[in-house]
Amino acid sequence: MITQKGKEHLAKDKQNIYLRILSGIVLVPLFVIAILWFKPLFYILMILVGMGMLSEWYNMTYSSIPYLLIGLIIIPIPISLLTFLSMEDTNRWLIMLYFCIIWSVDSFAMIGGKTFKGAKLAPKISPKKTWSGLVTGVLSAGLVAVLASFIPNFHIENYYFSNKIYLFIISCILALIAQSSDLFISYLKRKFNIKDSGHIIPGHGGVLDRFDSIILTAPVLFFISIL
């Protein structure tokens, strides 16, 4: 029998999912347009994302100079690398694929965790994350990447991304790193007693909550892209 507190928790989770969907309806088309057809908009979005992440990082870590300084390094780097990659027209599908991977792993990990449940991934850092969610998210992200490669006019010059087998493997690796990046931010939020880094994005929290995965994945993407 579900208690009143349990019912309230389920209702809150349901509302959160609806808000995530609504946010996605706005954010996803905006980024697709920016990446594929209007490069200046992507630059603006990256600047806004970077500013938002830095602002929320400061609000979270201002009491600790070492952690504050870490943010001044690890946030500008991925923003700069993604912006640099996007300057080359031939990389537009690479950037598009990248966001498909890091966003799909987050969504499918949540769905997989709620569906299959099971052992917790890191109960002290992020109590809601499960091993089943991680596996579901990583494999789904790899599948999404392969399916995306069949879109008409899809083309990535890099061999490792154009080969379907390598694409699946690399996408799974990026998805796994994205989850590690998410856990890193979750650890910091626990350390500094913060539930969400902000509230600007409905259903997600702050900019840092939504884009935390780029911190570790963007450098990896850049490295693979120049091989």
Curated annotation (Swiss-Prot):
It comes from the Bacteria. GO terms for molecular function: phosphatidate cytidylyltransferase activity. Pathway: Phospholipid metabolism; CDP-diacylglycerol biosynthesis; CDP-diacylglycerol from sn-glycerol 3-phosphate: step 3/3. Its EC number is 2.7.7.41. Signal peptide: none annotated. It holds the Pfam family CTP_transf_1. The chain crosses the membrane at residues 31-51, 65-85, 93-113, 131-151, 165-185, 206-226. It catalyses: a 1,2-diacyl-sn-glycero-3-phosphate + CTP + H(+) = a CDP-1,2-diacyl-sn-glycerol + diphosphate. One of its GO terms (biological process) is CDP-diacylglycerol biosynthetic process. Keywords: Cell membrane, Lipid biosynthesis, Lipid metabolism, Membrane, Nucleotidyltransferase, Phospholipid biosynthesis, Phospholipid metabolism, Transferase, Transmembrane, Transmembrane helix. One of its GO terms (cellular component) is plasma membrane. It is a multi-pass membrane protein. It is found in: Cell membrane. InterPro entries: PC_trans. Belongs to the CDS family. This is Phosphatidate cytidylyltransferase. The lineage of its organism: Bacteria, Pseudomonadati, Pseudomonadota, Alphaproteobacteria, Rickettsiales. The gene is cdsA.
